Amino acid sequence: MSLTDGNIIEIDNLSFKYARQNKCILKNLTLNIKDGQWIALIGHNGSGKSTLARLIDGLLKAESGSIKVDGYEMNEKNIWDIRKKIGMVFQNPDNQFVGADVESDIAFGLENQGVPREEMVSRVADALKVVGMEKFATHEPARLSGGQKQRVAIAGVLALRPKIIILDEATSMLDPEGRKGLITLIKDLKDEYKFTVISITHDIDEATLADRVIVLDDGKIIDDGKPESIFIKNDELLNIGLDIPFAEKIRRELTKKGVDIPNKYFTEEEMVDWLCQFKQKN
């Protein structure tokens, strides 16, 4: 099915509220996501990020409005075809594990899709190799570290060959090193396999790596753009309870101390380069 203007996801005038609640979590939200983009969804708790992800995957039903995924309208007829196109990795991978060992857990989703056994064995092996977990194929998931569990969860998603991967706070329970390793892995996989990534995160430094950042507040999109255009607006982010990137914190502190630093967005690498040049000149 052909995509409209290259949009893998099209959301129009979407509203949603939970049962027994008067207030809408999402309010007349309209959003298009291009095929192959890495999107970071940021916002404080209760802003509607995870709710939006579950609506895209068909786990929740919208109050009003429409969702299209890969050209398919979200409805009872298409919902299972849509779910085959989406893989979700959650905050706590233990909630996703159903197999006695790693390889049987990854095979579970393939069995549900009726994948022939020979192909299933090949896909499981390939997915484990891609995430660097082939040596743990016969291990119990419960005995793995947090980072290893998330790699297995990602392998389970990759084996299904989705067009969209949704990361719902997938790195929040990892230490900084594990978080960095997992994001690097996903970025490399995205570049190789050309899937779309939607990352729901509280980690602002993680969000800086996205192609596009969408800021949600009170169920509405209040900002949308490239990381450099979003994270230069420090005061606006702080006012809605969000953090700012580490490099921006440094830039703000240097400015307060009277250092003549450009009023522009810096990535961490750019900040390190600027500080090195500044030190050489002074």
Curated annotation (Swiss-Prot):
<feature type="binding site">
    <location>
        <begin position="43"/>
        <end position="50"/>
    </location>
    <ligand>
        <name>ATP</name>
    </ligand>
</feature>
<feature type="domain" description="ABC transporter">
    <location>
        <begin position="9"/>
        <end position="243"/>
    </location>
</feature>
<keyword id="KW-1003">Cell membrane</keyword>
<keyword id="KW-0472">Membrane</keyword>
<keyword id="KW-1278">Translocase</keyword>
<protein>
    <recommendedName>
        <fullName>Energy-coupling factor transporter ATP-binding protein EcfA1</fullName>
        <ecNumber>7.-.-.-</ecNumber>
    </recommendedName>
</protein>
<dbReference type="InterPro" id="IPR027417">
    <property type="entry name" value="P-loop_NTPase"/>
</dbReference>
<dbReference type="InterPro" id="IPR050095">
    <property type="entry name" value="ECF_ABC_transporter_ATP-bd"/>
</dbReference>
<dbReference type="GO" id="GO:0043190">
    <property type="term" value="C:ATP-binding cassette (ABC) transporter complex"/>
</dbReference>
<dbReference type="Pfam" id="PF00005">
    <property type="entry name" value="ABC_tran"/>
</dbReference>
<dbReference type="GO" id="GO:0016887">
    <property type="term" value="F:ATP hydrolysis activity"/>
</dbReference>
<dbReference type="GO" id="GO:0042626">
    <property type="term" value="F:ATPase-coupled transmembrane transporter activity"/>
</dbReference>
<comment type="similarity">
    <text>Belongs to the ABC transporter superfamily. Energy-coupling factor EcfA family.</text>
</comment>
<dbReference type="InterPro" id="IPR017871">
    <property type="entry name" value="ABC_transporter-like_CS"/>
</dbReference>
<comment type="subunit">
    <text>Forms a stable energy-coupling factor (ECF) transporter complex composed of 2 membrane-embedded substrate-binding proteins (S component), 2 ATP-binding proteins (A component) and 2 transmembrane proteins (T component).</text>
</comment>
<dbReference type="InterPro" id="IPR003439">
    <property type="entry name" value="ABC_transporter-like_ATP-bd"/>
</dbReference>
<dbReference type="InterPro" id="IPR015856">
    <property type="entry name" value="ABC_transpr_CbiO/EcfA_su"/>
</dbReference>
<comment type="function">
    <text>ATP-binding (A) component of a common energy-coupling factor (ECF) ABC-transporter complex. Unlike classic ABC transporters this ECF transporter provides the energy necessary to transport a number of different substrates.</text>
</comment>
<dbReference type="InterPro" id="IPR030947">
    <property type="entry name" value="EcfA_1"/>
</dbReference>
<dbReference type="GO" id="GO:0005524">
    <property type="term" value="F:ATP binding"/>
</dbReference>
<dbReference type="InterPro" id="IPR003593">
    <property type="entry name" value="AAA+_ATPase"/>
</dbReference>
<keyword id="KW-0547">Nucleotide-binding</keyword>
<keyword id="KW-0813">Transport</keyword>
<keyword id="KW-0067">ATP-binding</keyword>
